[in-house]
Swiss-Prot record:
Alphabetical list of InterPro entries matching this protein: Bact_HORMA_1 (IPR041162)
Required for binding to CdnC and to confer phage immunity: region residues: 141-172
Protein name: CD-NTase-associated protein 7
Family affiliation: Belongs to the bacterial HORMA family. HORMA1 subfamily.
Amino acid sequence: MSSYSYTVAETQTFSVTHARHMAAKVATDLRRMQRFYGYPSDADIEAYEEELVVFLKAGYLGEVSYGFQKNNNWIEPTLRYTAGDLLGSGTDDDPGKIRPGKDVSGASFYSFMTYSSKYLNATQSEKDTALKDLPFKRVGAQSPGINGYLENDKTYSAGGRSLTRTSVRNFV
């Protein structure tokens, strides 16, 4: 009786093209949110997309959320994207499926980002070099809570990395 085994090693280099591909999908989600809810502005969407390209390319993104906040809590519609390494062949979903008609009266549009362990372990010089092209600087803030729950609904991937999208949903 014979047995055979083999190993396949696959390496991919994550490029700015891969980062742009994934960031463009997030920008499309934000444009759909804008169409239904009036925010974010075109200029903000462009800046968020540029920021995301820089953070994805550097490997410095942990999570980023875009959406509406009321009483220091995210409400529906809010989208959270979590960066990770792609395991296996992965999925690269089409953007979209933003639910229309949610009540955002009295809420403010907001974005919040957390950083990866690679960012936290980088030297200041490495951070300065990687982040020199950011369109704006974020300031420290407390992470908002969630009024509802998070539902995994999309995965965007390219070049061996992924962004998993979760959406805030109401308990109703």
